[in-house]
A protein has these predicted regions:
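Signature of Asx- and small-polar-rich beta-strand/turn repeats characteristic
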Residues: 1-290, 294, 298
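Hydrophobic alpha-helical segments, chiefly the membrane-spanning helices
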Residues: 302-304
């Protein structure tokens, strides 16, 4: 390896930059799926003279638009108007892509790294579950953490890092800091594979999802009225090499606390990944406790 690749400021190869950023506990942002907001409405049918009490929009593909497939990532249930029988899903957030499930069977006798095999995985949609064996139906949800503070031997967490070729890797605890997975357990990874920014600015959608009421009746797609409340936006490419080199040392220097104006800016950008840039300033005379944050997003500017 060339000497310049051993240092973050001068490194140019992404895998080398990512490995150096790991030393600063920095996880580069993955590709991000475009998202839109829909309103869905349909007329339910009476059963024995009464309308169903509620209706559920099932997780999975719900719409097509702009040559893409759009999904909801969890079941959504709303109540049915008992007088009219109309059910309304007022703010349905949909994301572009395909939902993928990938499983590993735990083998502690070999060094096992749990890789997400898809390069275009939106890591913000990642759900990690562990079940006792292949035939088990119940599973435990594990949460991502980036610090060992307050973790016990039984805390169900995982640690995330970008690996080679922009494919992310998951590691579990060691029964000291976080629970370790056991032989024969099954690790289930669910995430969205997306086209990123290509899915932006789509405003016309056709419903393809599944809606089921409390009596078990499934409604045809043609019976659903669909209205676009917000066209698709916020799809983005994975974080660039230059962005990683800039953000990693600043994220590390903040150390999860906001003291300086730069700390506020870095932490805010980490939380609000739709921000193009963040500027924080404050410390004005007689108002030392006030920090102003100006955040131009990809669609508008937010100040608070």
């Amino acid at each position: 390896m060339a000497l310049n690749e051993a240092f973050l400021p001068s490194s140019t190869v992404r895998d080398n930059v990512v490995n150096l950023a790991k030393l600063l506990n920095y996880v580069p942002r993955s590709i991000q799926a475009a998202k839109a907001c829909l309103k869905l409405e349909l007329q339910t049918n009476q059963v024995n003279g009464a309308y169903p009490s509620n209706i559920t929009l099932k997780k999975g593909p719900v719409a097509t638009g702009g040559n893409f497939v759009w999904n909801v990532l969890a079941d959504t249930t709303v109540e049915v108007n008992t007088s009219t029988g109309i059910a309304t899903f007022d703010k349905v957030s949909i994301k572009e892509g395909s939902i993928v499930n990938f499983q590993y069977i735990v083998n502690t006798f070999a060094k096992q790294i749990y890789k997400i095999p898809s390069e275009d995985a939106d890591i913000s949609t990642l759900a990690v579950r562990v079940k006792a064996n292949e035939s088990a139906t119940a599973s435990d949800l594990y949460n991502q953490v980036d610090t060992v503070t307050n973790l016990t031997a039984t805390t169900r967490v995982y640690f995330l890092a970008e690996g080679e070729d922009m494919r992310y890797e998951i590691r579990f605890g060691d029964d000291s800091v976080g629970r370790a997975v056991k032989d024969g357990e099954v690790v289930d990874l669910e995430y969205l594979v997306t086209s990123g920014p290509d899915g932006n600015q789509v405003g016309t959608f056709s419903f393809i999802g599944k809606i089921e009421d409390s009596t078990g009746k499934v409604y045809p797609t043609a019976s659903v009225n669909i209205v676009t409340k917000q066209k698709s936006q916020q799809g983005d490419k994975a974080e660039s090499v230059e962005s990683i080199k800039y953000n990693a040392p600043r994220y590390y220097s903040a150390q999860y606390r906001a003291v300086t104006a730069q700390d506020y800016a870095i932490i805010t950008k980490n939380i609000y990944d739709n921000a193009d840039s963040v500027v924080a300033y404050g410390g004005d005379a007689l108002n030392l406790s006030l920090i102003h944050i100006s955040e131009p997003t990809r669609q508008a500017e937010i100040s608070y």
